[in-house]
């Protein structure tokens, strides 16, 4: 690829995204597919574009993304985190705006483990008085 590209890794739940940014016309390619083709629902596309819209670079950068693991929501969050990190590598002056929007912090929430004696993480077995 080009020599003036910037990289960022993003993670969310069990998903991990590798994001490569280079100056271009606004193409977003995820796992060799277009953004709208990869994510069927508009909310996921919106989540992916949030950091770019915040710093007003939707039409100025091309993104090449590979993402693995998890589901649609987790992958979208991982991509957003990766784009944010790549943008900060591209221009460090964008960090305060991205930090204020809450995109820099990795969302550490993940599935709570199932406990012994319970049906799920917190769901108890049905209680019978008699």
Curated annotation (Swiss-Prot):
Swiss-Prot/TrEMBL keywords: Ribonucleoprotein, Ribosomal protein
Tell me which InterPro entries the record gives: Ribosomal_Su5_D2-typ_SF (IPR020568), Ribosomal_uS9 (IPR000754), Ribosomal_uS9_bac/plastid (IPR023035), Ribosomal_uS9_CS (IPR020574), Ribsml_uS5_D2-typ_fold_subgr (IPR014721)
| An MF annotation (GO) of this entry | RNA binding
Q: Which GO biological-process labels does this protein carry?
A: translation
Q: What's in the GO CC field? A: cytosolic small ribosomal subunit
Which SUPFAM superfamilies does the entry link to? Ribosomal protein S5 domain 2-like (SSF54211)
On whether Transmembrane helix is a keyword of this UniProt record, the answer is: no
The keyword Ribonucleoprotein belongs to this UniProt entry's keyword annotation: yes
Pfam families (alphabetical): Ribosomal_S9 (PF00380)
PROSITE patterns named in the record: RIBOSOMAL_S9
Provide the family line: Belongs to the universal ribosomal protein uS9 family.
| Name used for this protein in its record | Small ribosomal subunit protein uS9
The source organism is Vibrio vulnificus (strain YJ016)
């Amino acid at each position: 690829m080009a020599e003036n590209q910037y990289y960022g890794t993003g993670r969310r739940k069990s998903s991990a995204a590798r994001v490569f940014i280079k100056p271009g016309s606004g193409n977003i390619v995820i796992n060799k597919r277009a953004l709208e083709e990869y994510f069927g629902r508009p909310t996921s596309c919106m989540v992916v574009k949030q950091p770019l819209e915040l710093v007003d670079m939707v039409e100025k950068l091309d993104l090449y993304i590979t993402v693995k693991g998890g589901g649609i929501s987790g992958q979208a969050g991982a991509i957003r985190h990766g784009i944010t990190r790549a943008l900060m590598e591209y221009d460090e002056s964008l960090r305060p705006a991205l930090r204020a929007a809450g995109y820099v912090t990795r969302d550490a929430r993940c599935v709570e483990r199932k406990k012994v004696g319970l049906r799920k993480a917190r769901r108890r077995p049905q209680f019978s008085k008699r």
